[in-house]
Curated annotation (Swiss-Prot):
Entry keyword annotation includes tRNA-binding: no
Annotated keywords: Disulfide bond, Plant defense, Secreted, Signal
Disulfide bonds: C53-C93, C190-C219
GO cellular component: extracellular region
Natural source organism: Oryza sativa subsp. japonica
Protein name: Xylanase inhibitor protein 1
Gene name of this polypeptide: RIXI
Amino acid sequence: MVALGRRSWLVPLAMVLAVSSCLAGPAMAAGKTGQMTVFWGRNKNEGTLKETCDTGLYTTVVISFYSVFGHGRYWGDLSGHDLRVIGADIKHCQSKNIFVFLSIGGAGKDYSLPTSKSAADVADNIWNAHMDGRRPGVFRPFGDAAVDGIDFFIDQGAPDHYDDLARNLYAYNKMYRARTPVRLTATVRCAFPDPRMKKALDTKLFERIHVRFYDDATCSYNHAGLAGVMAQWNKWTARYPGSHVYLGLAAANVPGKNDNVFIKQLYYDLLPNVQKAKNYGGIMLWDRFYDKQTGYGKTVKYWA
């Protein structure tokens, strides 16, 4: 696919980073990383994926959601965005060294993994429809573009077999070493542990965990204060030291909620504390539509 040149340096760079981490230790990850992730695909008025990447604000954009799977049907909901241009937009983002992930799950109820076989079937579809599998006869909604990784946003249903799905997806790294690697991330609720994702996360195959410190009054800053956030943050970072843990923030106050952290409190109180973690990874914003309205990310970017 396009951006092979971009990926060609990933292997040698990974080797350098691995050596560096052995020499310097995980403490090198503490403090600002400059990494900011945003979710895209939940509102047609947020603009195109290309426009999102052209803002220069984000280092990763997560397409949401691949929301129908597990029962022989596979489909996504991108809120009316034109599928015909998304493939080209993915390549455009990748050409700017912005990673594009596909998030599976979401708020709908049309997904689950009733058996280990269904997990294998879903992994097969994701690999061939959205990544570098490209088996003939498998519909590719984004054409020949391949996403950089898969995000697990399992917010509904039973927790069964998501660990199997993670293992099946990750196994493609051994089967196709010369191709685009399968990178796994998870987006979880802030209260530790997230019961739907615990078994999957315990596989230790997830390089990032985006923890949503919103939508839950027990651990969102505006409701629970710094102590409420840190009580959960410290559990996430301690339990998964091999994963980069991202601070998930609401880019606006959704009607009926008060989860958007005021800029001054974010800068002086929240970020200095979460960035003490050795495996702090960056900031995740929900979502592009709200960020476009408020401009929250334009300020937060420099503190991530």
